[in-house]
């Protein structure tokens, strides 16, 4: 069993399949977990951030349901912590029509059976004194959580290794090996590796693997983030507006983000990106104006044409996709691992996934049922 890509998605799938006693080889083009997973802020928010994301909500809710067990298992197998905390989010609305925007969000979340409560600005400021005077309305989202993605990746890779996953660094995959209509392995820069099944979880690099663009037309979307330290501001929970978010870490740092940029594979931090983030941050929490800016970085999210992930079997037997998670890779890791394990082991998952099929981008609309035959 080969997993192509060692980020949070690939590592989670590898661990899940290793638990089922499969021999799993995890291949990464460089060091596992050093791309989008390393750069993420670590917010676990199942609510839709745009109309395009509505089909994702059931999947996100299921992943949130799985998260406590997922974290407990990873931490137990690795002996390491992940920084997971369900501290909730205060969502603030600063526009003149903020109350109307807040009420629309509350109605939408309630219709989707997501926990949310409209709160007054006084209640919001009592909970988080750093909130600025621009706040016109607020909502409390008690079920949302955060973790430290870098700690999670360290724990995941350790857990996978302890379960027998063979982790190969600096192993970029160039193409699939096909025997008729059956994927029988991969071609790396150095060698050929045979396998009964291959799962591609290579994020924004998936489309660059020869022949996979028709299933995984991913593209990089740059996100820049900052880390702040403040002696006068301490947050107990995530603060979020339409312009910025602030995520507290257990080490006292505050992660601020982020940008959404179509900048190709350019991963550097820019003055314009930093300014955009800081403008939103200082409107959200003006007291952070005197904070120390201790770090800045950028990552490449795997975008797709419809902003939805690409999950499941292709029309090539033994070839599966688990990519294109865009801004939701950390959030969707547990449910993605469960779904891919079901496909590989049983042929069919127990969850509606038509929205996410790799075949939605191809001209051929034939079913992938035969191609999804489980490992024998």
Locations of regions flagged by a protein language model:
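Short beta-strand to alpha-helix junction loop
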Residues: 58-61, 92-101, 139-158, 268-273, ...
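Beta1/beta-strand and adjacent pyrophosphate-binding region of the FAD-binding site
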Residues: 1-9, 25
């Amino acid at each position: 069993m080969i997993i192509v890509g060692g980020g949070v998605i690939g590592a989670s799938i590898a661990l899940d399949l290793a638990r089922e006693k499969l021999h799993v080889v995890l291949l990464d083009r460089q060091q596992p977990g050093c791309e989008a997973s390393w750069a993420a802020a670590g917010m676990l928010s199942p609510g839709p951030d745009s109309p395009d994301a509505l089909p994702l909500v059931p999947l996100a809710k299921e992943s949130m349901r799985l998260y406590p067990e997922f974290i407990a298992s990873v931490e137990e197998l690795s002996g390491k912590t992940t920084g997971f905390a369900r501290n909730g989010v205060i969502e603030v609305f600063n526009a003149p029509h903020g109350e109307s925007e807040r009420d629309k969000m509350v109605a939408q979340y309630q219709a989707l059976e997501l926990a949310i409560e409209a709160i007054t600005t006084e209640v919001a400021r009592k909970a988080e004194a750093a909130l600025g005077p621009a706040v016109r309305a607020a909502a409390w989202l008690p079920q949302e959580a955060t973790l430290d993605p870098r700690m999670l990746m360290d724990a995941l890779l350790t857990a996978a290794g302890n379960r027998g996953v063979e982790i190969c660094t600096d192993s970029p995959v160039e193409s699939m090996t096909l025997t008729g209509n059956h994927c029988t392995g991969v071609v790396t820069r150095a060698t050929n590796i045979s396998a009964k099944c291959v799962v591609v979880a290579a994020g924004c690099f998936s489309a660059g693997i020869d022949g996979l663009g028709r299933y995984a037309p991913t593209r990089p979307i740059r996100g820049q983030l900052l880390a702040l330290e403040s002696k006068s501001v301490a947050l107990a929970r995530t603060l979020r507006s339409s312009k910025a978010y602030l995520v507290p870490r257990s080490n006292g740092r505050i992660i601020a983000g982020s940008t959404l940029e179509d900048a190709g594979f350019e991963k550097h931090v820019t003055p314009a990106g930093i300014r955009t983030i800081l403008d939103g941050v200082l409107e959200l929490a003006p007291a952070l104006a005197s904070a120390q800016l201790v770090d800045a970085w950028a990552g490449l999210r795997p975008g797709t044409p419809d902003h939805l992930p690409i999950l499941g079997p292709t029309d090539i037997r033994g070839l599966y996709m688990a990519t294109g998670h865009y801004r939701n890779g950390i959030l969707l890791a547990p449910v993605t691992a469960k779904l891919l394990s079901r496909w590989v082991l049983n042929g069919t998952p127990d969850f509606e996934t038509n929205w996410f099929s790799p075949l939605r981008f191809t001209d051929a609309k034939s079913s992938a049922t035969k191609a999804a035959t489980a490992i024998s």
